Amino acid sequence: MRKGNPKQIHDWNDLIKPGVSVITPNPKSSGGARWNYLAAWGYALHHNNNDQAKAQDFVRALYKNVEVLDSGARGSTNTFVERGIGDVLIAWENEALLAANELGKDKFEIVTPSESILAEPTVSVVDKVVEKKGTKRGGGSLPEISLLARRSGNCREKLLPSARR
């Protein structure tokens, strides 16, 4: 979100307040945006005693506050960071870290909601490719963004046993 948190956004319920402009990718075209949608849905279910109608109303109110619905996560990050649109960006942790650390540490801050989804995308390593490119690191290979997050000290990522080889 914008530095200083001028709209006082601390959790999912703050995103449905009037006057809050949300940026998130379209869950119909972005895999990551589906996790955003499901995290909001899970929060709404939990805080409404599993009442699906109330959860649907919550998610509908959230998406009414979405100013730009980009087709993908990086597009939403660009809309928020480069175009300056929106009060808050709903994003995967790596996109939030990219915005804060690489594109404007003095302009953004990260707020972690009380509830979210733990998504653990799989990573495949093609030995011939990593050997040829010299990208194999420390007995295993991780995506560059994961390494960036680890260096920043903000990553809560856990490595699965299969990723520790």
PLM feature segments, named:
Residues 14-17, 31, 81-84, 102-104, ...:
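Extracellular/periplasmic catalytic domains that process cell-envelope and extracellular macromolecules
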Residues 130-165:
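Extracellular/periplasmic juxtamembrane helices and adjacent flexible linkers that interface
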Residues 47-114:
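Ligand-binding pocket segment of bilobal, Venus flytrap-like solute-binding proteins
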Residues 13, 38, 42, 60, ...:
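Solvent-exposed, polar/charged alpha-helical surfaces in well-ordered, non-transmembrane soluble domains
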Residues 1-46:
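A conserved helix-loop-strand patch within extracytoplasmic ligand-binding domains
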Residues 4-7, 27-32, 94-97, 115-118, ...:
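Solvent-exposed loop/turn segments at secondary-structure junctions
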Residues 20, 119-123:
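Small-molecule pocket liners
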Residues 6, 27-34, 53, 71, ...:
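Soluble non-cytosolic domains of exported or imported proteins
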